[in-house]
Design a protein with these regions (language model features):
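Conserved phosphate-binding catalytic cores of ATP/NTP-utilizing and phosphoryl-transfer enzymes
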Residues: 12-34
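Flexible, glycine/charged-enriched surface loops at secondary-structure junctions
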Residues: 28-34, 91-95, 107-112, 148-154, ...
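Internal helix-turn-beta structural module
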Residues: 129, 133-157, 163-235
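Adenine-nucleotide phosphate-binding core of ATP-dependent small-molecule kinases
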Residues: 96, 103-107, 114-149
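Conserved active-site and cofactor/substrate-binding residues in soluble primary-metabolism enzymes
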Residues: 8-12, 16, 43, 74-79, ...
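Short beta-strand segments
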Residues: 35-42, 48-49, 159, 211-212
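Short, small-residue-biased leader/transition segments that mark boundaries at the very start
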Residues: 2-4
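Conserved ATP-utilizing enzyme core subdomain
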Residues: 39-119
């Protein structure tokens, strides 16, 4: 059988924020180890070592990885087969369940929107709190595993709708990672939201950044690069 590829997703976002992180740090990206966390209704986390992605949480499809708004994230394949047999679901029905009715929505029983779940958890809804706790647990698990995979880390980047706007998710995630040297500045963290870029660590250990993604800008630059390259090749052929 042909091997199945690991595509990964949000590649344009991860490339943009990792490059931007190197710029604001004043360092060559080829000398840095960065974990980029694109957190939104769909989420993925990537290990960028010396400018190259060496691992990413999403795989063949966007279903893999940490728990998301309506997606399960990583799940035991046998659990899928068990549910299909027990409930008599077709492959299409199972795909719909895993992709559109699970994740934060399925656990909370309320919504896939982080803002709704945040309010419900604050009001004492146990399922909403569980959904947020599961989300935080899985984010920190990926950060920890990628830090180990790269033999260390120089910076963490949060981006995406939740990554840029949820000070709570950032704080609770980093609070469980002090053994890696992370030291979050809570005051700085609480001031960054709604598209604001900034550094939120206390100045010791690996840096922690919030960097708004610009996928359209990155695509425009990549397109410009390709057009320039094609133009040079055409001119060389004419000459």
């Amino acid at each position: 059988h042909d091997a199945l590829p690991i595509y990964g997703f949000h590649g344009t976002s991860h490339r943009f924020v990792s490059a931007r992180c190197a710029d604001v740090m004043g360092e060559d990206i080829k000398k840095l180890k960065i974990v980029t966390c694109h957190l939104g209704n769909g989420s993925s986390i990537t290990a960028v070592k010396y400018g190259k992605c060496i691992d990413t949480s999403m795989g063949l499809t966007p279903l893999d990885g940490e728990i998301m708004g309506t997606r399960t994230g990583s799940i035991d394949p046998s659990a899928v087969l068990y549910i299909m047999k027990k409930e008599g679901k077709t492959p299409d029905e199972m795909s719909n369940l895993l992709n559109k009715k699970s994740g934060i929505l399925g656990v909370s029983g309320l919504s896939s929107d982080d803002r709704d779940v945040k309010v419900a958890a604050a009001e004492g809804n146990k399922r909403a709190k569980l959904a947020r706790d599961m989300q935080i647990y899985e984010i920190k698990k990926y950060i920890g595993s990628y830090t180990a995979a790269m033999d260390g880390v120089d910076a963490i980047v949060f981006t995406g709708g939740i990554g840029e706007n949820s000070a709570y998710i950032r704080e609770k995630t980093m609070a469980y990672l002090p053994h890696f040297g992370f030291n979050l500045d809570k005051e700085k963290n609480n001031t960054l939201k709604r598209g604001t870029e900034g550094r939120i660590d206390a100045g010791a250990g690996p840096q922690i950044w919030v960097i708004p993604t610009d996928e359209e800008g990155r695509i425009a630059k990549e397109t410009e690069h390709v057009v320039e390259q094609l133009s040079r090749e055409a001119n060389a052929a004419i000459a």
